[in-house]
Amino acid sequence: QAQEVYDKVAYCKAPRIGRGVRLDRKIRMQIWDVFDEYQNIMNEKLQRDVETAMYECRKILENKKLTGQYTSIIVDEGQDLSPSAYRLLRALAGEEHENDIFIVGDSHQRIYRNKAILSKCGINVRGRSSYLRINYRTTEEIRKFAFGLLNGVSFDDLDEDYDNGKGCQSLTHGDKPEIKEFATLEEELDYLVSRIHELEASGVEQKNICIVARTHKLLDNYIAGLQRAGIKSFEIKANKTDDRSFDGVRIATMHRVKGL
């Protein structure tokens, strides 16, 4: 779908660079049968997944000559948009013109598998892009720790080049991140409870403490553990704002705190 391949012949010829697993023609034919049946079911239900919806919207704009609906389009968190999304935005903006599309993105913050090469989506940024090197949100200690984890990993610049992250710096400072290791979940929960009490004793309110986990299962374990210790918690969910009138430790998945 990222390559907007919607027929069997094109699918068998579509490149799979970077996908990891090689598929010969026989396997591709078998996979196509599954995808074709999926498309038939979606058509019967008059439903579309996001990628197909964006593709069909763009085709409607192009076929009815409705492109160029907006003078300027601004994109934030551009690293998370798919090729289909960028092609749709290109159609909405129309032919290339001054200040047509402004994109802000950071591939280091990409948490979805969407990866678009802007030049292949009709968006020319070569010689027109700028790097923002000053971080006003994260402390220098956290920034160094994060880039240390990413050492040796290559990141794209949202086009056909790479961003090595060199030259970035933060203007604020704070404590160095600590790494704690635990043999069991119970040990981890005991530490969390004691750490929360330490922070409270130093004057930090519970609602200014946030526990972040990779999965919802881990969140459920943390919520149950805090409840047993008599500590209130407030889970930050999708489409639900953080109610600051409610006391309690904030708890969320890594997806929910993205951008904070």
Spans of features found by a protein language model:
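ATP-hydrolysis module of ASCE/P-loop NTPase motor domains
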Residues: 1-27
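Short coil/turn segments at secondary-structure boundaries
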Residues: 7-14, 45-55
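P-loop NTPase catalytic cores that bind/hydrolyze ATP
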Residues: 1-4, 32, 36
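Conserved helicase motor core of SF1/SF2 NTP-dependent helicases
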Residues: 24-27, 33-47, 59-260
